[in-house]
């Protein structure tokens, strides 16, 4: 046990954590040369393409240290993106130490700070590493100072390395062995294991990635999940060296996998505790929480007969992604589809891309919304995540919107622009701190505004230098109204938005003029209107196409021409009564592009 080291790597996107993991695996001989590929631990195509890590992965490596002993290192790769912060906290609570990898040319970023604080709160030993020191732009001195100023851990003796060219890999492994403590735990106590991650395999069912805290587990044991109370029989246990290798048992302090013939991912929840039925543990490990969806959007198949295929596809994705929630929904404009809940915008994009790529679906996605809390006149509190489900305004006492606390790290030159942006988005400044060349701004922002386009705007006002991290704070009452879009006098439910009253008129005008460009011209005039309740606040008309009915009249009496024109007018009127308007996919995306002024 004293020779086991469990550690994970904390880093911002693109600071080189997956490459570093590759080097460790290569150095310790976890895979043979022919099996090496770039980003071994990122198993999904979409992870490799976007260069991000979504699911946690592990590698059990053997390392012969300079003191001649062989150490068993368990590397747990964590996702770095803010949407997946719960997965990060699970991965970290399974470790005793974490490598804080910082790009020596870019310095500290917001998500690094957030994940690092999570690690420190969980009592994990943080070891700083400066990566990419072979870049001409690298400034290791400045960056180590930055780590000390911003995060407050000693970084003078931070290991300097370059994962790409393989410099300093051995130094990092030595530091891991010396600085990170060995796991504490009792191999003879009742079994306690933390589920770090779980995914679905077509052959064996659900595979659970676990960290054993106490006790041991071997095949044929009966295990029990403490959050759900479900019981299963263990079929096999083992470790990943990234390849899966079966073992006869897993003991306290180790990280490995358990397969127990489970059919549904819902029963193996990330962060839950596994124990034995015969000798159950007294209490579960702390920190388990149900993942809450933050962002909602409607997904509809373009062809309505694809509805069943879409449901199958979502169910299959859910096998691998327990944080995806969905329920059936009917829209008058779009037919049958699903209302889906996501962790954040990146998660929404990834799910959409996987549906299109892996399942070949054609989808229409409505604008993302957040959950609102409504206090009704009769004193009940309900949650609404779909604008078209909002009850009649006369019944509502107040609407509360979710507020998030966001931490923005930005270079000094761009502070003004970023503060202006936050104020436009109805943000309230909480704190501002200068640290070296960076400034850390803390704002309370309405989540509704962040979902729309805040992230893109933040990147463009700061030329890509600002980085953002956020967490949910509370629900707060606010003056919100529902903005409806009407085409030809009929409400299009899929285009409804909940907006702040001060932005409503501007938003309505923008949206309507965008829609006018996107709806194809018909044989009759189409009125596109934006309304709040019964008040129309903006209107545009899509002009009719018309045939020149006078082309065949040469000369002749004016009454003849009038008769033809009147006949055409009457025909157009009749068409307008029966005509319905096809709204193209782009119109639904137009909502996303409507920004606040």
Curated annotation (Swiss-Prot):
Any one of the GO BP annotations: positive regulation of translation
Gene3D superfamilies assigned: 3.30.70.240, Elongation factor 4, C-terminal domain, Elongation Factor G (Translational Gtpase), domain 3, P-loop containing nucleotide triphosphate hydrolases, Translation factors
Subcellular location per the Swiss-Prot or TrEMBL entry: Cell inner membrane
GO cellular component, one term: plasma membrane
Keywords from the UniProt entry: Cell inner membrane, Cell membrane, GTP-binding, Hydrolase, Membrane, Nucleotide-binding, Protein biosynthesis
UniProt record similarity statement: Belongs to the TRAFAC class translation factor GTPase superfamily. Classic translation factor GTPase family. LepA subfamily.
Protein name: Elongation factor 4
Source species of the chain: Laribacter hongkongensis (strain HLHK9)
Gene: lepA
